[in-house]
UniProtKB/Swiss-Prot annotation:
NCBIfam families: PRK00129.1, upp
Keyword Magnesium: yes
Keyword terms, alphabetized: Allosteric enzyme, Glycosyltransferase, GTP-binding, Magnesium, Nucleotide-binding, Transferase
SUPFAM superfamilies (UniProt xref): PRTase-like (SSF53271)
Cofactor or coenzyme needed: Mg(2+)
Family assignment from sequence similarity: Belongs to the UPRTase family.
Record flagged with keyword Kinase: no
Protein's UniProt name: Uracil phosphoribosyltransferase
EC number annotated for this UniProt entry: 2.4.2.9
Source superkingdom: Bacteria
Amino acid sequence: MSNVTVVSHPLVQHKLTKMRDKTTSTKTFRALMRETATLICYEVTRDLPMDEVQIETPVAPTKAYEIAGKKLVFAPILRTGLGMCEGMLDLVPSARVAHIGLYRDHETLEAVEYYFKAPEDIAGRLVIVVDPMLATGHSAIAAIARLKHYGVTNLRFVCLLAAQAGVDALREAHPDVPIWTAAIDQTLNDHGYIVPGLGDAGDRTFGTR
């Protein structure tokens, strides 16, 4: 799968294991999500374009390099994407943030949009869509379709954990959008949850169950 990257760094895998553990507290789970998102963001942004610039250090003039172009946009899918977005902003604090509110209909498992807010010039920016879980793929597909409707062409999708079915669905719907994840699990249960997964990422992040 040439457009799917599994981030196998030992720190990412260690933190994901702790998140999978059902005995991990809400406080620890939230911190681990933020830390893991920062590490994955490092991989996602490793090919950002650079400009050569001239600066002066306290010792001498020198050439150096800065990220080129407009500031990128993180687009967390509410609500759980917010936990990952914080970790990414730790690494790229100047990034803009778009918010995409989606919930999953528990009868149909389809994504239903209830909120959308993005920078006015989002079409000209790299947009990284963020959602901890890629299960059925419906939310990711809907979020990316919404962004494309606004003219966004440079898109990436980042999650902590994916199901193979979700990866396949997203690749079929948006073959131009590369995917980064810490792991791919093979199955979904009848409720659309990833197995073995890590449970409901939203409830575990916000302590709502």
